[in-house]
Amino acid sequence: MYALLEAIEARARMNRARVAMGIRDPNPKTLESAWRAQVLGYAQVVLVGDKKEIDRIGTDLEVVDTKDPEKVLSELLVSRKVDAAIRGTAKASGTLSNLKEALGMKRVCRLALLLTADETPFFLAPVGIDEGNTIADKLRMIILGAEHIRRLGVEPVVGVLSGGRIGDLGRDRRVDRTLADGEFVAARALGLGINAKHYTILIEDAIKESNFIVAPDGISGNLIFRTIAFLGGGDGLGAPVLMDDYVFVDTSRVGGHFTKAIMLASALSYLHKERKKVIR
C-alpha cells in the first residue's frame, strides 16, 4: 500500500490532466494548494468561482468566472472541457445534487482515500452521511470500491465494521443489528470473490490487516474520516465518486489544502483513459 501513493503521483505527472476546482470564499491557503499542484506537475488547474474574489488574493491559475461553482463544475465535467473535477471549497449539497442531475444519477457512491498519522494509506466507505444505510448499499460500495481499487494496482482487503464486539450481543437492539449486518456483508463479499472479514467494532485491528474499511453507516464513516484527517494527525486525499465515464473527487472544505486531491483526480483521469483504450 505504501507504493500506492507513489503510483498515484507518477500517473498524475504522466497525465497532467485539466482539473477543475470549485472555489467559494477563497483564501491564500486554498489558492496556494491549487497552485502547488500545478507547479508540481500534477495537473493544469482551473479555478471555478467568483473571479473578483479570487483576484483580490491573486493567482496565475486559469479562472472560470461564476457565482455558482456548484453547477458549473458539473457542466465543465459533462462537456469534457476538463478531464476531472474536485469539489474544493464549493458547497457539498449543491455540488453533489448538480452532479447527480447532470449525470442522471439517483445516488452517488464515494470512496475516501486517507492516511493515518503514521502515513498508512487506506480506503474508507461510506463517508456521506446519507450513504451506506442498508445492506444493499454497503455491498454495492464494496463491489464498486473493490473494482476501482484494483484499477490502482492494489488487491482490496475489506475490513467490515459494526457497533460492538460479538460478546456485546443482547445489550442493545441496534448494536445487535449492526453485528448481524457486519457478519452478513463480510460473508456475502467473500462469496463474490472479495477478500473480506468482519472486525466488529475493532477498527484498530481492521486497519492492521485491511486496506478498505467499511463503516457501519455513513455517519460513523464521516466521523472516522474527520477524526483521522482533522484531529488524529492523518490526512484525507479526497473521496472519488465511483463512476466509469467521469472523474469527480469530493473534498472537505475544513482542511484547506487540496494539492493531493488534485493529484488523485489527475491520476484517476489517466486510469480512465487507459481503461477506455483497453475496452476499445
From Swiss-Prot:
Keywords tagged on the record: Methyltransferase, Transferase
GO molecular function: methyltransferase activity
SUPFAM superfamilies in alphabetical order: Isocitrate/Isopropylmalate dehydrogenase-like
Coiled coil: none
Gene3D superfamilies: Isopropylmalate Dehydrogenase
Principal EC category: transferase
EC number: 2.1.1.-
Top-level taxon of origin: Archaea
GO BP terms: methylation
Assembly and oligomerization: May be part of a complex composed of 3 subunits; MtxA, MtxH and MtxX.
Annotated family: Belongs to the MtxX family.
NCBIfam families xrefs: methan_mark_4
Protein name: Putative methyltransferase mtx subunit X
Organism expressing this protein natively: Methanosarcina acetivorans (strain ATCC 35395 / DSM 2834 / JCM 12185 / C2A)
Gene transcribed to yield this protein: mtxX
